[in-house]
UniProtKB/Swiss-Prot annotation:
This is Neurokinin-B. One of its GO terms (cellular component) is extracellular region. Keywords: Amidation, Neuropeptide, Secreted. It is found in: Secreted. The modification Methionine amide is found at residue 10. Transmembrane segments: none annotated. Belongs to the tachykinin family. It comes from the Eukaryota. Its main location: secreted. InterPro entries: Tachy_Neuro_lke_CS. GO terms for biological process: neuropeptide signaling pathway. Tachykinins are active peptides which excite neurons, evoke behavioral responses, are potent vasodilators and secretagogues, and contract (directly or indirectly) many smooth muscles.
Amino acid sequence: DMHDFFVGLM
């Protein structure tokens, strides 16, 4: 989901 997307960028 959107949260996992941002976690992937980190």
